[in-house]
Amino acid sequence: MGTGRPARKKAQGIGGPGSLYTLEVQLIGGPVTEDFVSENPLVSRTIQIAGKQTLERLHHAIYLAFDREEEHMYEFQIGGKGLMDPKARRYVLSAAMVDPFDDRKPAGDVTRTTIGSLGLKVDQPFGYWFDFGDDWWHQITVLAIHDHVPRGRYPQVTNKTGDSPPQYIDWDGEDDDADD
């Protein structure tokens, strides 16, 4: 028997600038110790961001959510079949729009590309690569797309699982302690 109310819509809106995206950002690679991994088998952050906000804003939210110390180059990879898939659309910093050492043309600039313009769908994963020297790899999964953005400040972290690894590990320091 019905309740007289319309059926509740799942959070699978069509997306766009007026939508709110809930994203899970999972750390999947980087310079971490075995001890850290055993103590933190899953390190992820859930972030909500408005569709009108840019990939640059998402980067800053991830940067703060994972307690990073220093800025580095980064890019987002949308589509393809995994990280570094040459068929993925790459969104990069302005300085990386022309790279004489990379023949793959970027799809866009992170400072101008909005979340809502990417055509994301619920359950769709995409990649975020931070610090091209240390290679911090993250998989971002779209958990929900809401057709309305409630009042509030976005982006915002709504959940944290696991500790943030240190951005830089003192690999030599571990050996020094053994010599004392």
Where are the regions that the model predicts?
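Short linear regulatory motifs enriched in tryptophan with gly/pro/ser
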Residues: 1-180
